[in-house]
């Protein structure tokens, strides 16, 4: 299993959730990046408010750390309603979901993180709730059991997932607003870093923010985590202000290189280059070669490397691109 404390992992770790909450934008106008998604949401939210209706059910998907939870909270704030949050693995029984649904008020947002991990029993309860705002529940056991229908107030279900393909077709079809979040560009990430530094009361110049953004793998959660570590370095080794040079020294010390790669990324790329002559190599062989699970490679390591053009995924397996060779000062064989 991949190290739980990997500095550039996009999943939550340690105090991330508490600190991220303090830095989260509250409204769409404060939200940086994801321009297409933001523009769509503004229209959908305004239309729902004009009609005095609950917003349509929404599925937010994409790699971890890009702001799915933040967007769900922004939706609730923009609509002026309450939000109740839970996650797929927590909803073990139909009664768990029923308890949440029956406590919703008209227009409220129910946010389910990791919605692809809902159990089939819970998912069945969700279908009529999403479509007809009705809750079908069984009362009693055995021959005396009977089904009753409860009316629910109109509500908005916001589901978040890193694996949209793992959702069942019936569940996916019930979301009227699908939103895909993409990795952030350096410009948007540097804006996020500067905003977070301001919230933290940290002096940072534009070049320092850009340097952190470059090494943040297109992910705001990683950018904020690196910013906190660079702040530590700046306070101990310098005067507390973050410049480009301070950021470079701090991140080099943390073994996060100019592309945002750490030991695990370099290990994966070098395995393809050295052990499998650049590929193609199958996922199972690659997982065995670096001592990781295939899910870790698919869900954590690969997405950014593919998006940045360092790995190519083909029907025959993974291939290291010319860019991967150049990263290590090598020339790809013809």
From Swiss-Prot:
GO biological process entries: DNA recombination; DNA repair
UniProt xrefs under Gene3D superfamilies: 1.10.8.60, P-loop containing nucleotide triphosphate hydrolases, Winged helix-like DNA-binding domain superfamily/Winged helix DNA-binding domain
Keywords in alphabetical order: ATP-binding, Cytoplasm, DNA damage, DNA recombination, DNA repair, DNA-binding, Hydrolase, Nucleotide-binding
One example GO MF annotation: four-way junction helicase activity
Enzyme kind, highest EC tier: hydrolase
Annotated positions binding Mg(2+): 69
Function recorded in the entry: The RuvA-RuvB-RuvC complex processes Holliday junction (HJ) DNA during genetic recombination and DNA repair, while the RuvA-RuvB complex plays an important role in the rescue of blocked DNA replication forks via replication fork reversal (RFR). RuvA specifically binds to HJ cruciform DNA, conferring on it an open structure. The RuvB hexamer acts as an ATP-dependent pump, pulling dsDNA into and through the RuvAB complex. RuvB forms 2 homohexamers on either side of HJ DNA bound by 1 or 2 RuvA tetramers; 4 subunits per hexamer contact DNA at a time.
Primary location class: cytoplasm
Designated name of the protein: Holliday junction branch migration complex subunit RuvB
SMART domains from the UniProt entry: AAA (SM00382)
Chain residues that bind DNA: 294, 313, 318
Origin: domain of life: Bacteria
Compartment(s): Cytoplasm
Binding site for ATP: 24, 65, 68-70, 131-133, 174, 184, 221
Organism: Shewanella sp. (strain MR-7)
Keyword presence, DNA-binding: yes
Written domain comment of the UniProt record: Has 3 domains, the large (RuvB-L) and small ATPase (RuvB-S) domains and the C-terminal head (RuvB-H) domain. The head domain binds DNA, while the ATPase domains jointly bind ATP, ADP or are empty depending on the state of the subunit in the translocation cycle. During a single DNA translocation step the structure of each domain remains the same, but their relative positions change.
Region of interest (Head domain (RuvB-H)), residue spans: 258-334
GO CC field: cytoplasm; Holliday junction resolvase complex
């Amino acid at each position: 299993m991949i190290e739980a404390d990997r500095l550039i992992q996009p999943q939550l770790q340690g105090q991330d959730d508490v600190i991220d909450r303090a830095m989260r934008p509250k409204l769409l106008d404060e939200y940086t990046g994801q321009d297409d998604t933001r523009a769509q949401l503004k229209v959908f939210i305004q239309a729902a408010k004009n009609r005095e209706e609950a917003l349509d059910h929404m599925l937010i998907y994409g790699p971890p750390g890009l702001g799915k939870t933040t967007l769900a909270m922004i939706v609730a704030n923009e609509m002026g309603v309450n939000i109740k949050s839970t996650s797929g693995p927590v909803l073990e029984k139909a009664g768990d979901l029923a308890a949440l649904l029956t406590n919703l008020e008209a227009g409220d947002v129910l946010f389910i993180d990791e919605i692809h991990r809902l159990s089939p029993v819970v998912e069945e309860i969700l279908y009529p709730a999403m479509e007809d705002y009705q809750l079908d529940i069984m009362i009693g056991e055995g021959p005396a059991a009977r089904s009753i229908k409860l009316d629910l107030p109109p509500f908005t279900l916001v589901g978040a997932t890193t694996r949209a393909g793992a959702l069942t077709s019936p569940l996916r079809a019930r979301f009227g607003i699908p939103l895909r979040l993409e990795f952030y560009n350096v410009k948007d990430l540097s804006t996020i870093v500067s905003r977070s530094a301001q919230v933290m009361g940290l002096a940072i110049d534009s070049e320092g923010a850009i340097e952190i953004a470059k090494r943040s793998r297109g992910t705001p959660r990683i950018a904020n985590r690196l910013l906190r570590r660079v702040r530590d370095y700046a306070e101990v080794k310098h005067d507390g202000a973050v410049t480009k040079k301070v950021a470079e020294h701090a991140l080099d010390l943390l073994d996060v290189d100019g592309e945002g790669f750490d030991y695990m990324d370099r290990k994966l790329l070098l395995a393809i280059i050295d052990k499998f002559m650049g590929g193609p190599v199958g996922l199972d062989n690659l997982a065995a070669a670096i001592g990781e699970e295939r899910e870790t490679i698919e869900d954590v390591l690969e997405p950014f490397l593919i998006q940045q053009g360092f790995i190519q995924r083909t029907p025959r397996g993974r291939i290291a691109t010319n860019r991967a060779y150049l990263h290590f000062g090598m020339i790809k064989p013809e």
